[in-house]
Amino acid sequence: MGNRAILAVDAGGTSIKYSLVSNDTLDQLTEEHFFNMPSSGTKEELMGTFAAVLEGAMEQSRKIDCTIASTAFSVPGPFDCKNGISLMPHKWAAVKGVCLPEEFERMNILPPHIPTYFLHDVHAFLVGEKFFGAAANHTNTLGIIIGTGLGVGVWENNDLGLDENGNPLYSIFKRPFREGILEDYVSGRAIREAYRCVTGLSHDAKTIEIAARNGDDVAKKVYRDMGTILGENIRDIVERHRIECIVVGGRVSLAFDLYQDALCEAVGHGVTAYASKLLESAAMRGVAAWSVHCQKNK
């Protein structure tokens, strides 16, 4: 076969998608293909979905005359990314503790003994934005995902900041804050709850965003306050890693302009902050780039 390709996979709690990416140029070689992910299913159902992804990728590789030379997965956490083992008690519970690379080898679908990489989803997002997106012209960068939850990743000195399992250095979502944890105050549900406490109305974050854009002062303050809280709680990370750029993804990033100034003011240090440029494609672009980065830095 001709070109070498990376099988880039974005595996979430409820869906999974893949694409083939050039190992040389990191250009996308195929369109994205989507599958439902049976998060609460049996081991057989979950592994069957992974098998469908691998079989689909092999079929695509034959169509475009390329060889799959590595695989790279963006995954939720907690996850042992070094060994490819899910540690999640709720999502994919039936494969908790299972070594996925060994399962893939036993399927005998992909070429044998190709390298397989796993990357926490916030890191996949960060690498995508660092190589191809909003942070491309910066060095030390902090990636933040705000959606149903809260996650951060650090890119410093041309590499990811990783813990012993290959995960993000900081689990700021569970930092104690006020009457709970930080995620209670910086997330989609935090926006809903803050607005409800003042107005008595139960709206989702998108509705509150629209209200803010239409002049609702309470809605605008809710977003500004979230930006301030986030900025104050990441300032120590920014200082420790000499961060010069912050890039924010996740669903709440779609309202980024409503809290950007408050975030930057709270962080200080002249740090620049951007909303995601790549949006839903950041993770797959990121894991493909990470695969090449790892191969070059063995």
Where are the regions a protein language model picked out?
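Conserved phosphate-binding loops in N-terminal lobes of ATP-dependent enzymes
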Residues: 3, 7-75, 82
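Glycine/GP-enriched mid-protein hinge/lid loop-to-helix segment characteristic of carbohydrate kinases
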Residues: 5, 19-21, 30, 42, ...
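A short acidic Gly-Thr/Ser loop motif
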Residues: 9-15, 144-149, 251
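Adenine-nucleotide phosphate-binding core of ATP-dependent small-molecule kinases
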Residues: 38-64, 179-181, 192-258, 272-283
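Glycine-rich phosphate-binding loop and adjoining helix at the ATP-binding site
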Residues: 39-40, 47-51, 66-71, 77-140, ...
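Stable alpha-helical structural segments in soluble proteins, enriched in small hydrophobic residues
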Residues: 53, 57-61, 126, 134, ...
